[in-house]
């Protein structure tokens, strides 16, 4: 029968229907009809109502309707992959919204055909964020309209309200959406994979993209491949409605899709598990809600829900299974109802429209539920649920994650503009002869707000001006010390997709960056350097480009050469010309290749990795004295004492280190970079990681922690292969150990073919007998290395975490091209090893939070426990330094100290401030956890809150038992009992004699580090017998003394509010 159903709309194209008025009257029957025609296979269908039907006579009287929470949609990304962030704005009326939507800034651009408008949408998606009046509770239907009234569709979804008295806004109540040009809805399926209906009341059209339900898993795999960080945090992250993928990307990866434009006065129907996305052409108003048929029940039972937020919509399927699948109810409750969904089959209600041979198989004793029988839906067999005693309760359909961003921070600062078009960029060749211009203080402009890309959205070709009269002169040491220098800090912005320069004038002591003076260049055009994605075309040798504002200045990143220890030197005219030629040649090569991978090339002569070996005769080799060696006190660094690269090679120490790491989860030297993240976020490792000593070294299989995108991502290029050749079907990979150096890796992480995974396997370095070679990107030995440029070697983990490093052969994870790493990365100083080494070496990464300048080598950060986790494309790894660690996670990670009676602690007083107090006694209280019928939960109910039975006398209900809960608002709600939790409570007494009973989470010991929120409200009682200390409503805090800015640096001053917003 399935084969016959596949003949219905076999191409899974979006179908359009034109019902007559008679057909249009019965909504549920017409939905069954369009499914009998195969409309559900596309995941989306259009229905054009009869011309004589109108839901409302006029829309002239809605101007005063209030949009309570408009959202501004900020989009970041490039090359067809985007993330949408929603920022909540203040309430406005429809009149105000229309005025904004039709203004010159937000109005629809001119276009001749839809394809042109579609190109403009995807090209300008990240510019000029629009405002969306979404999720407005209400309807524009007139009360007398019964046909297709979105407020009362009378489908089986009404059972949710009839059985439990629960209404969920936007799910079984209508929502209004006021759109403008470029407002978007990201790729998603409906909550609980329900059907949805969308009617466009008036205004400009709305474009839709749809992926057939039978190909939905392929779209999910593609999204997880490009956004592994989001996928690890939440299995159903697409339900967050933040992911936009262009049709070109879908076509590129062979995912079937279709598109359609909805005009005013037309309906769109989405079907279960039908992924859809789209955008508005201009000012319009739409209304939508969800509904269900009997076919949806199986989808609802198997829907994968968002696990990271408790406020996501969740509907109990109990009532639906009992009513419509009674013979499968017990099996389903036991978790054994494993039905495979056939997306091609129409709903059972479509039987009357199908021939006998096309009828879908009936599931047992399912009975029809015609629309006219809905009033008596409660009257079922013996096992039917009783109607809840609870009154109506309003839930909320959580559509979008909104960010609160201070108004002081400009949007261009938070989300830099990036040109996403396919325009070609040409650079005129630099002249060989450059006239001298002496570096001065004014040749360097200070930039505190970050450099943004010039806006080239309206141009078809961009040419960089020829640099004239540019030269670097040699300066003696006195002149270098006298001149002001540019202190560069390079930060991979966590949202913007680029690195940001922030400059500061030279001070007596620099917190970051090289301690030497920098060279400066003057020119006719001011320049900056966007150091963004992997393989974008930079060789990291010389980078010259133009600011949006031209004021006649140029800065050039120079290679790290050394003069007398760590001092930098200037370029000669001939050297600069050679470097420029090499850079221009690399640009031409990259332009010809159009993103295709190129074989490893030799590093340029002035590359820092080349210069590191060119140590002058008067430079002594770096050695630590015995006194310095004995100063090691930090616990994380003690096991590494023999592994620093400034010490003599010690292969036995490396081997011992590798053996130790092999015994620790996740047992892979490459996956180790995500070790801290998994321990903190998931409370350790699952059983798949196991104990390495339990199984034979060559037989153990575990699941790698590193997503494939971390190896394949090339930043701005999306030409990547998301296949994993050495992974098993269950996602695990075999662990192999080198017989010589004992390093242990996953075959997939290191690129070991299954045929070579034997007990005699040797890593690449041992196979090449390069036992004294070290990683050129960090300062530690040990771990898994692969070959890089010029016979150098790099840690695979270092290559993964450094955005611009590139695996040439992705399957084999080698060789690694490090030539595209920008020069300023090599100038960063690692906060962990700068005290342990006399000179800077290797290449650092930085904290991903805002503009945090904290820098560290990948291997140092991993050893010190810095949290690194997979990030979303185009980034690879998201790094959180110790300064930005979440306090709650830090406190939860370590076991809380036990507290005894009589102990002095710090806790929150009833006046809202924290004081020192004494623990009087310890008690144990029992709290109940329940799941409410609307999907919400509570884990701190008192036994007396359960009103359906006397829990104080008879104890807690059985797990899964339906109970009635009296909430704090005095209403009674239906819920299911989950568990009872005995919690240790502490009765504390403050110095004023007042006592409180608090949980352990609300108590801090005197030797415990207090969170910032506690420190800010910490007070000490005075000696005045506490008069009015504990009773006053607000305790005034001592004001921080205002800092006076030196007039010399007044132009460099940042407003405190802006600084706090940036750092947050």
Swiss-Prot record:
<dbReference type="GO" id="GO:0032452">
    <property type="term" value="F:histone demethylase activity"/>
</dbReference>
<dbReference type="InterPro" id="IPR047479">
    <property type="entry name" value="Tudor_KDM4A_rpt1"/>
</dbReference>
<feature type="cross-link" description="(Microbial infection) Glycyl lysine isopeptide (Lys-Gly) (interchain with G-Cter in SUMO)">
    <location>
        <position position="471"/>
    </location>
</feature>
<dbReference type="GO" id="GO:0001650">
    <property type="term" value="C:fibrillar center"/>
</dbReference>
<feature type="region of interest" description="Disordered">
    <location>
        <begin position="616"/>
        <end position="641"/>
    </location>
</feature>
<dbReference type="GO" id="GO:0140684">
    <property type="term" value="F:histone H3K9me2/H3K9me3 demethylase activity"/>
</dbReference>
<keyword id="KW-0804">Transcription</keyword>
<comment type="subunit">
    <text>(Microbial infection) Interacts with HTLV-1 Tax protein.</text>
</comment>
<dbReference type="GO" id="GO:0031625">
    <property type="term" value="F:ubiquitin protein ligase binding"/>
</dbReference>
<feature type="binding site">
    <location>
        <position position="240"/>
    </location>
    <ligand>
        <name>Zn(2+)</name>
    </ligand>
</feature>
<feature type="compositionally biased region" description="Acidic residues">
    <location>
        <begin position="616"/>
        <end position="634"/>
    </location>
</feature>
<keyword id="KW-0479">Metal-binding</keyword>
<dbReference type="GO" id="GO:0005721">
    <property type="term" value="C:pericentric heterochromatin"/>
</dbReference>
<dbReference type="InterPro" id="IPR047481">
    <property type="entry name" value="Tudor_KDM4A_rpt2"/>
</dbReference>
<keyword id="KW-1017">Isopeptide bond</keyword>
<dbReference type="GO" id="GO:0140005">
    <property type="term" value="F:histone H4K20me2 reader activity"/>
</dbReference>
<feature type="region of interest" description="Interaction with NCOR1">
    <location>
        <begin position="597"/>
        <end position="638"/>
    </location>
</feature>
<dbReference type="GO" id="GO:0140681">
    <property type="term" value="F:histone H3K36me2/H3K36me3 demethylase activity"/>
</dbReference>
<protein>
    <recommendedName>
        <fullName>Lysine-specific demethylase 4A</fullName>
        <ecNumber>1.14.11.66</ecNumber>
        <ecNumber>1.14.11.69</ecNumber>
    </recommendedName>
</protein>
<dbReference type="GO" id="GO:0000785">
    <property type="term" value="C:chromatin"/>
</dbReference>
<dbReference type="GO" id="GO:0008270">
    <property type="term" value="F:zinc ion binding"/>
</dbReference>
<dbReference type="GO" id="GO:0010468">
    <property type="term" value="P:regulation of gene expression"/>
</dbReference>
<feature type="zinc finger region" description="PHD-type 1">
    <location>
        <begin position="709"/>
        <end position="767"/>
    </location>
</feature>
<dbReference type="InterPro" id="IPR047482">
    <property type="entry name" value="JMJD2A_ePHD"/>
</dbReference>
<dbReference type="GO" id="GO:0010629">
    <property type="term" value="P:negative regulation of gene expression"/>
</dbReference>
<feature type="binding site">
    <location>
        <position position="206"/>
    </location>
    <ligand>
        <name>2-oxoglutarate</name>
    </ligand>
</feature>
<keyword id="KW-0863">Zinc-finger</keyword>
<feature type="region of interest" description="Disordered">
    <location>
        <begin position="501"/>
        <end position="537"/>
    </location>
</feature>
<feature type="binding site">
    <location>
        <position position="306"/>
    </location>
    <ligand>
        <name>Zn(2+)</name>
    </ligand>
</feature>
<keyword id="KW-0862">Zinc</keyword>
<keyword id="KW-0156">Chromatin regulator</keyword>
<feature type="compositionally biased region" description="Low complexity">
    <location>
        <begin position="509"/>
        <end position="532"/>
    </location>
</feature>
<keyword id="KW-0223">Dioxygenase</keyword>
<dbReference type="GO" id="GO:0045892">
    <property type="term" value="P:negative regulation of DNA-templated transcription"/>
</dbReference>
<feature type="binding site">
    <location>
        <position position="234"/>
    </location>
    <ligand>
        <name>Zn(2+)</name>
    </ligand>
</feature>
<dbReference type="GO" id="GO:0010507">
    <property type="term" value="P:negative regulation of autophagy"/>
</dbReference>
<dbReference type="InterPro" id="IPR003349">
    <property type="entry name" value="JmjN"/>
</dbReference>
<keyword id="KW-0408">Iron</keyword>
<dbReference type="GO" id="GO:0014898">
    <property type="term" value="P:cardiac muscle hypertrophy in response to stress"/>
</dbReference>
<dbReference type="InterPro" id="IPR001965">
    <property type="entry name" value="Znf_PHD"/>
</dbReference>
<feature type="site" description="Histone H3K4me3 binding">
    <location>
        <position position="945"/>
    </location>
</feature>
<dbReference type="Pfam" id="PF18104">
    <property type="entry name" value="Tudor_2"/>
</dbReference>
């Amino acid at each position: 029968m399935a084969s016959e159903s596949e003949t219905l709309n076999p191409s899974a194209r979006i179908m359009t229907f034109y019902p007559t008025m008679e057909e249009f009257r019965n909504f549920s029957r017409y939905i069954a009809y369009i499914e009998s025609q195969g409309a559900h296979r596309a995941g989306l269908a259009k229905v054009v109502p009869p011309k004589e039907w109108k839901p409302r006579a006029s829309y002239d009287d809605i101007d005063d309707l209030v949009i309570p929470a408009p959202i501004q949609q900020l989009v970041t990304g490039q090359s067809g992959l985007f993330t949408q962030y929603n920022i909540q704005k203040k309430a406005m009326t429809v009149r105000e919204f229309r005025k904004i939507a039709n203004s010159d800034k937000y109005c629809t651009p001119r276009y001749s055909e839809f394809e042109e408008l579609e190109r403009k949408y995807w090209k300008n998606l990240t510019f000029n964020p629009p405002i969306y009046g979404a999720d407005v509770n209400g309807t524009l239907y007139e009360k007398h309209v019964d046909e297709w009234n979105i407020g009362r569709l009378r489908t089986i979804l009404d059972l949710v309200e009839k059985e439990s008295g629960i209404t969920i806004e936007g799910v079984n109540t209508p929502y209004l959406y006021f759109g403008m040009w470029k407002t978007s809805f990201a790729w998603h399926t409906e909550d609980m994979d329900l059907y949805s209906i969308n009617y466009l009341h008036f205004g400009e059209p709305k474009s839709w993209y749809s992926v057939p339900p039978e190909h939905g898993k392929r779209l999910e795999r593609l999204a997880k491949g490009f956004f592994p960080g989001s996928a690890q945090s939440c299995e159903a992250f697409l339900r967050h409605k933040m992911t936009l993928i262009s049709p070109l990307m879908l076509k590129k990866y062979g995912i079937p899709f279709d598109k359609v434009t909805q005009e005013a006065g037309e309906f769109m129907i989405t079907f279960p598990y039908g992924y859809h996305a789209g955008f508005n052409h201009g000012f319009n108003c739409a209304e939508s809600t969800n509904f269900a048929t009997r076919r949806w029940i199986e989808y609802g039972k198997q829907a994968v829900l968002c696990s990271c937020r408790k406020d996501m919509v969740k509907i109990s399927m109990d009532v639906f299974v009992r009513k419509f699948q009674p013979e499968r109810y017990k099996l389903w409750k036991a978790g054994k109802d494993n039905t495979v969904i056939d997306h091609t089959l129409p709903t059972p209600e479509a039987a009357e429209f199908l021939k006998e041979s096309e009828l879908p198989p009936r599931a047992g004793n399912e009975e029809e539920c015609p629309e006219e029988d809905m009033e008596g839906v409660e009257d079922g067999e013996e096992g039917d649920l009783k109607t809840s005693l609870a009154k109506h309760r309003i839930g909320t359909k959580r559509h979008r994650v909104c960010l609160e961003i201070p108004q002081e921070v400009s949007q261009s600062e938070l989300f830099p503009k990036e040109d996403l078009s396919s325009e070609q960029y040409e650079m005129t060749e630099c002249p060989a002869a450059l006239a001298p211009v002496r570096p001065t203080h004014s040749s360097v402009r200070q930039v505190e707000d970050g450099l943004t890309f010039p806006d080239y959205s309206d141009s078809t070709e961009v040419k960089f001006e020829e640099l004239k009269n540019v030269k670097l002169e040699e300066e003696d040491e006195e002149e270098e010390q006298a001149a002001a220098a540019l202190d560069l800090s390079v930060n991979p912005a966590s949202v913007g997709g680029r690195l940001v320069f922030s400059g500061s004038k030279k001070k007596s002591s620099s917190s970051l960056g090289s301690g030497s003076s920098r060279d400066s260049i003057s020119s006719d055009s001011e320049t900056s350097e966007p150091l963004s994605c992997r393989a974008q075309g930079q060789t990291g040798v010389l980078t010259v480009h133009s600011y949006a504002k031209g004021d006649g200045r140029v800065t050039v990143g120079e290679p790290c050469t050394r003069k007398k220890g760590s001092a930098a030197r200037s370029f000669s005219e001939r050297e600069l010309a050679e470097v420029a030629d090499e850079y221009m040649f690399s640009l031409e090569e990259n332009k010809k290749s159009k993103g295709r991978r190129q074989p490893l090339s030799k590093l340029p002569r002035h590359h820092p990795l080349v210069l590191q070996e060119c140590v002058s005769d008067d430079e002594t080799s770096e050695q630590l004295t015995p006194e310095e060696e004995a100063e090691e006190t930090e616990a994380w660094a003690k096991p590494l004492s023999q592994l620093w690269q400034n010490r003599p090679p010690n292969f036995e120490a490396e081997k011992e280190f590798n053996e130790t790491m092999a015994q620790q989860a996740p047992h892979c030297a490459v996956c180790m970079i995500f070790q801290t993240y998994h321990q903190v976020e998931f409370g350790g490792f699952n059983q798949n990681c196991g104990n390495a000593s339990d199984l034979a070294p060559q037989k153990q299989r575990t699941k790698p922690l590193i997503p494939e995108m971390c190896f394949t991502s090339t930043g701005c290029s999306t030409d990547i292969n998301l296949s994993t050749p050495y992974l098993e079907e269950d996602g695990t990979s075999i662990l192999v150990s080198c017989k010589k150096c004992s390093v242990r890796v996953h075959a997939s992480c290191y690129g070991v073919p299954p045929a070579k995974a034997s007990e005699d396997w040797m890593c690449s370095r041992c196979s090449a007998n390069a036992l004294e070679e070290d990683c050129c990107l960090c300062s530690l030995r040990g771990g898994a290395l692969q070959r890089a440029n010029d016979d150098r070697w790099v840690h695979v983990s270092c290559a993964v975490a450094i955005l611009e490093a590139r695996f040439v052969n992705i399957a084999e994870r080698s060789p690694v091209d490090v030539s595209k790493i920008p020069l300023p990365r090599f100038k960063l100083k690692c906060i962990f090893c700068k005290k342990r080494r006399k000179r800077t070496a290797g290449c650092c990464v930085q904290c991903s939070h805002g503009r945090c300048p904290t820098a560290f080598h990948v291997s140092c950060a991993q050893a010190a426990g810095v949290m690194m986790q997979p990030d979303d494309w185009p980034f690879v790894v998201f790094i959180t330094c110790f300064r930005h660690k979440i306090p709650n996670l830090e406190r939860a990670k370590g076991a809380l100290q036990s507290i005894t009676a009589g102990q002095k602690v710090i806790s929150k007083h009833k006046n809202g401030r924290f004081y020192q107090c004494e623990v009087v006694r310890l008690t144990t209280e029992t709290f109940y956890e329940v799941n409410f019928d609307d999907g919400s939960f509570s884990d701190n109910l008192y036994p007396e809150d359960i009103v359906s039975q006397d829990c104080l006398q008879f104890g807690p209900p059985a797990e899964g038992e339906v109970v009635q809960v009296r909430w704090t608002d005095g209403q009674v709600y239906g819920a299911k009992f989950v568990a009872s939790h005995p919690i240790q409570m502490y009765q504390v007494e403050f110095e004023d004699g007042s006592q409180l009973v608090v949980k352990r989470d609300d108590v801090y010991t005197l030797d415990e580090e207090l969170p910032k929120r506690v420190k800010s409200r910490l007070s000490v009682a005075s000696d005045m017998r506490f008069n009015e200390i504990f009773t006053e409503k607000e305790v005034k805090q001592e004001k921080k003394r205002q800092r006076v800015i030196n007039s010399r640096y007044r132009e460099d001053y940042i407003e405190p509010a802006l600084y706090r917003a940036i750092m947050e």
